[in-house]
Amino acid sequence: MLARAGVVKWQLVYTKQAKRDAKKLSAAGLRPKAESLLKILGENPFQNPPAYEKLIGDLAGAYSRRINIQHRLVYEVFEDKKVVKVIRMWTHYE
């Protein structure tokens, strides 16, 4: 899922749903954009740009970045463990 280029300072872990979403992204031709965002998360999950937003409601505590106009990469950050948990990589409006 994540290209091996560059130094990864944060460990990325993926939910089962995120792994399923990765297959959808590949089929939709969105894999390069998603890989670019994942690389940024591995280096610094709070880097801006690209912009991110803190989510509320059911996903309170998580963050979201745009893959495209419809789809978002949703993740949680565990600063104490230097872990980024990727929750979704498709729309979070379903």
What is each PLM-predicted segment?
Residues 1-24, 28-36, 56, 65-72, ...:
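Enriched for short, Lys/Arg-rich terminal
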Residues 39-66:
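A short, surface-exposed loop/turn module that caps and links secondary-structure elements
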